[in-house]
Amino acid sequence: MYQVGVDIGGTNIAMGLVDETLDVVQRRSMPFEVEGGGERTAEIIYEGVLAMLKEQGAGTADLDSVGVVVPGSIDPAGSVIINAYNLNFHNEPLKAKIKKHFGDIPVFLANDADGAALAELHKGAFVGCRTAVLFTLGTGVGGGLILGGRMFHGGLGNGCELGHALLVSGGEPCTCGNKGCIEAYCSATAIIRDAVRAMEKHPESLLFERTMGKAERMNAKTAIDCAKEGDSAALEVFNNFVDHLGSAVASMINLLDCERVAIGGGVSAAGEFLFEPLRKNVHEKSFFENHGSVVPAVMGNDAGIIGAAMLRRNEE
């Protein structure tokens, strides 16, 4: 039997046919048609699944479930996308629209960051863990929580918004409208903001040279690369970033006594340049002497597909 995993993004719908060993044996990537709404999205998913099954020499009778993850909030019943701004979905009953095509085959719907944590649990950095936390650091900060060996949906079913836990009271403004959120300090966007400020303050810096003093040329990789090369302005930005991320990670360890915290997303590509000082920072701030480890997330681009495919297993 196969599980289908579908990862809906702002530009593409990635889907895969996942076998019992959690290998993705067939893949499809199809454009997301924002103007088509939920009806067209359900059709695209069905068409893609049929194509994958045909390629695999299988049929719908060989399907065990269809799992879908989206970058947005899901209602407690796991049926309606409350808000997914990048998709222009608001109170969208996507599960029911997909189910119309698949009949008796179970369909599951979840947030994409929660799905990524589930993928790490079944095939990645969290294998064997009962309690673990995933931070995904990109334009924003997402995250997922594993409690008792299962994806945590929240007490009221609203999920886990790690990026919007408060880190600095009255601090930097966040996209959510609050101030001082983890996302406002630990995202690629935060690195860019602080690097631009440092560049403008230090025209002699490598940050200034690499961007020709233009804010629009700054990105997180440039800032981190300058820090790796020893630029003092960039190092100050990077060290502040590590300090804030260390506080966020240590807080989760102190709260949950989790076995493992994984860091994913584009910023994690900095490798040991990030993880070595981060582990030291977390150790200094952890209440427990014997605390959980801090590791890179490993699922990469397959996190959405594998996590979506594992949604049924999470409910068993």
Describe the function of each predicted region.
Residues 1-65, 75-78, 96-107, 119-129, ...:
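ATP-binding/phosphotransfer module of carbohydrate and carboxylate kinases, centering on a glycine-rich
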Residues 7, 67-71, 110, 134-140, ...:
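Short beta-strand segments
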Residues 24, 80-81, 151-152:
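Hydrophobic "anchor" residues
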Residues 28-30, 85, 155:
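Short hydrophobic alpha-helix segments
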Residues 31-33, 89, 158-161:
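A short acidic/small-residue loop/turn micro-motif
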Residues 79-90:
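A charged helix-plus-loop insertion that forms the helical arch/lid used to bind
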Residues 116:
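Proteins enriched for Cys/Gly/acidic motifs involved in redox and nucleic-acid/cofactor modification
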Residues 127-185:
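Glycine-rich phosphate-binding loop of actin/hexokinase-like ATP-binding domains
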